[in-house]
């Protein structure tokens, strides 16, 4: 078996495991039912897009309504099977993300395959990944943005030289190779298709979620690092689209940004309410913005703070420090980050520092861009794309370390090194297993919402006179039982945390 085949088999196993757990989560009540009911009343996909343009004064996300309308039409065509369509779409996108991760990593050797196994544990074990695949509103736009980022980077990895030159074929009559006429145009068309696809990914991502603007940083950082799959003309087009986005948002739709106190966020060891934020930072918002940007940038490499809140420090002060959870999360993150920093500080075959290579440089750009976009409030999901590229850097670091250890480790040191590697991998595997627990808990919570947030316990999210889908959605959610994870023994919540 070739190493690349083993890598793709491993990728498929991860994709199936994550997708199966994602599919079990019912369509949630909060942030979903109202959108579904409103979009279902629109006559067409174009009308849904138009509705999305004017749905909010702060959020420009018309592609959410557009995709939702397309999925609703598909569900109606299948006999109103909403759970099948929406959860199937969610599960499929989770599998696509993991597949794109391996496609971008490009494992070729057995060292690469081993490093990929570790990197997939890092990817699925990060707290940013949990939020990215668990929530859906009613589609998971954070997951879609991460997919668009990987797609643009994969397009940047393409080799344009093969598109611009017509291939040569040996001509016996001339005694030398001759260019094959008519082939150059088709190769040039392929290059144009890549540019168009990159621009389309950015346009769709930016209209899906505000953090979709980070897709532009992927394209520019990849080009700055030496990748030429996306041409300079396409970068100019992406820059023009960015300007157009700002003009549409500010000049055309008169939208405003998120102000202090619109959403709760963490500060220090506390989670502040919207009222607390207005009182504490209403006159000096720059303090909150600076803290939120910094804490968002730290949450990927350190797994702390969570949504701006230093939960480990707060738990230690309160005497509720969950040793296994916090120590495992923080220590494994420190080890992975140390490997990434070591790798980026080394020099490649060309003599330059590896932080300037495509994946590390893009990872730094996405981390900075995502943190800047989360200035108003910290949220782990906003940093999910940065978490994906962080795991890619860890892949490169582990692959390089494996090659060096295989070539230079003496017989007496191989066993201790193997034990250390096994311990670190097992710790990350423990974190990755926690993803399955959190997804199972998310499925139970989403199902419970259909009881606790509906009459007689709560007013319905949509008035009964306007509800055309709610009863069917509730029946589908309650039809299949979900295990109550809070009754499991031992208390898995203390092993994998509540974040």
Residue ranges of model-derived segments:
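Perimembrane helix-loop-helix junctions
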Residues: 214-247, 251-256, 266-270
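Transmembrane alpha-helix segments characteristic
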Residues: 119-120, 337-374
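Membrane-interface alpha helices of multi-pass inner-membrane proteins
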Residues: 192-209, 216
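Membrane-lumen/periplasm interface segments of multi-pass, membrane-embedded glycan/lipid transferases
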Residues: 30-80, 250-337, 384
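Membrane-embedded, lumen/periplasm-facing catalytic core of multi-pass transferases
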Residues: 412-499
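Transmembrane-helix signature of polytopic, membrane-embedded enzymes
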Residues: 101-129, 145-146, 361, 365
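Transmembrane-helix motifs of polytopic, lipid-linked glycan transferases
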Residues: 88-112, 150-154, 337-346
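Hydrophobic/aromatic-rich transmembrane helices and adjacent perimembrane loops
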Residues: 140-142, 369-370, 377-400
């Amino acid at each position: 078996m070739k190493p690349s085949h083993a890598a793709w088999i491993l990728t498929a196993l991860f994709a199936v495991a994550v997708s199966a757990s994602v599919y079990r989560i019912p369509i949630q009540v909060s942030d979903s039912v109202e959108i579904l009911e409103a979009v279902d009343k629109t006559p067409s996909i174009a009308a849904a897009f138009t509705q999305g343009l004017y749905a909010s004064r702060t959020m420009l996300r018309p592609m959410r309504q557009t995709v939702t309308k397309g999925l609703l039409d598909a569900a109606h065509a299948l006999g109103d099977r909403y759970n099948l369509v929406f959860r199937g779409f969610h599960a499929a996108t989770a599998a696509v993300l993991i597949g794109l991760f391996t496609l971008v990593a490009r494992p070729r050797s057995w060292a690469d395959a081993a490093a990929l196994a570790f990197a997939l544990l890092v990817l699925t074990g990060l707290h940013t990944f949990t939020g990215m695949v668990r929530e859906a509103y009613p589609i998971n736009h954070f997951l879609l943005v991460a997919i668009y980022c990987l797609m643009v980077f994969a397009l940047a990895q393409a080799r344009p030289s093969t598109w611009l030159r017509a291939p040569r074929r040996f001509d016996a009559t001339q005694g030398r190779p001759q260019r094959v006429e008519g082939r150059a145009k088709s190769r040039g068309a392929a290059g144009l298709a890549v540019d168009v696809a990159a621009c389309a990914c950015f346009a769709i991502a930016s209209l899906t979620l505000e953090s979709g603007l980070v897709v532009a940083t992927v394209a520019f950082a990849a080009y700055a690092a030496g990748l030429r799959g996306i041409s300079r003309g396409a970068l100019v087009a992406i820059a023009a689209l960015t300007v157009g986005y700002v003009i549409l948002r500010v000049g055309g739709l008169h939208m405003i940004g998120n102000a202090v106190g619109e959403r709760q966020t963490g500060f220090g060891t506390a989670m502040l309410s919207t009222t607390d934020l207005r009182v504490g930072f209403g006159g000096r918002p720059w303090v909150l913005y600076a803290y939120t940007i910094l804490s968002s940038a730290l949450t990927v490499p350190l797994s702390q703070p969570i949504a701006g809140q230093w939960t480990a420090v707060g738990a230690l002060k309160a005497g509720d420090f969950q040793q296994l959870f916090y120590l495992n999360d923080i220590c494994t993150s420190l080890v992975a980050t140390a490997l990434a920093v070591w790798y980026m500080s080394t020099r490649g075959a060309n003599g330059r520092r590896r932080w300037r290579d495509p994946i590390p440089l893009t990872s730094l750009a996405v981390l900075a861009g995502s943190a800047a976009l989360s200035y108003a409030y910290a949220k782990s999901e906003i940093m999910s794309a940065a978490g994906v590229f962080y795991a890619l850097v860890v892949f490169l670091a582990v692959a390089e370390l494996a090659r060096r250890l295989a070539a230079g480790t003496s017989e007496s040191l191989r066993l201790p090194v193997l034990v250390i590697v096994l311990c670190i991998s097992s710790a990350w595997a423990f974190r990755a297993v926690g993803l399955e627990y959190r997804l199972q808990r998310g499925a139970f919570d989403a199902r419970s919402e259909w009881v606790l947030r509906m009459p007689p316990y709560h007013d319905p999210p949509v008035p009964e006179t306007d509800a055309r889908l709610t009863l069917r959605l509730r029946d589908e959610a309650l039809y299949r039982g979900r295990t109550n994870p809070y009754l499991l023994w031992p208390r898995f919540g203390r092993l994998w945390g509540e974040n």
